[in-house]
């Protein structure tokens, strides 16, 4: 199973926040070969500053692959990034043009790029705690077969949730 991590999972892990143990369980599953973990290269725009920027370069040491992203002027790497889907971009523009003051916030451009690259690479599930992405999970699944979940829901679904055992 090919799992893409959103940037907020990395911050939780690196900053020793309360949900760090969930990220550690995902890393253990990857170390066992049960899942493949990846981040998209757009994470470099999410995390431009030290000390976390250099942490991106060490992700492969903990079992997280860095995949390409969507080609975007000013943020494009030959041989890594790929052209986007017109249908996906049209969908994003539809949502943005329909958005009105007071509506729930939409994902920002980096979030859209993470989701878009995840879809183009045929990955299985995108894990995040970002409310803007989670609010769109049903429509993303219906229109593009992009499965967006919280790490908690994912771990329960694959049968590794041990919260009932006090962990």
Language-model features: where?
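Active-site regions of enzymes building and remodeling cell-envelope glycoconjugates
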Residues: 53-72, 145-148
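Short, well-structured N-terminal submotif of metal-dependent ribonuclease cores
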Residues: 1-62, 166
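Short, flexible loop segments at the rims of nucleotide/cofactor-binding pockets, characterized by
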Residues: 14-17, 101-107
């Amino acid at each position: 199973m090919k799992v893409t991590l959103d940037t907020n999972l990395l911050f939780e892990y690196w900053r020793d926040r309360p949900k760090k143990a969930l990220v550690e369980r995902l890393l253990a599953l990857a170390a066992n070969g049960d899942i493949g973990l990846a981040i998209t290269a757009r994470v470099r725009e999410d995390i431009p500053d030290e000390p976390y920027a250099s942490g991106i370069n060490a992700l492969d040491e903990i079992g997280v692959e860095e995949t390409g992203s969507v080609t975007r002027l000013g943020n494009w790497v030959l041989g890594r990034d790929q052209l986007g889907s017109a249908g996906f971009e049209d969908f994003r523009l539809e949502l943005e043009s329909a958005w009105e003051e007071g509506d729930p916030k939409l994902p920002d451009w980096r979030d859209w790029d993470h989701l878009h690259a995840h879809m183009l690479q045929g990955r299985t599930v995108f894990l995040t705690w970002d409310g803007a992405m989670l609010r769109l999970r049903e429509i993303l699944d219906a229109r593009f077969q992009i499965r967006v979940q919280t790490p908690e829901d994912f771990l329960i679904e694959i049968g590794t949730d041990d919260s009932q055992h006090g962990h």
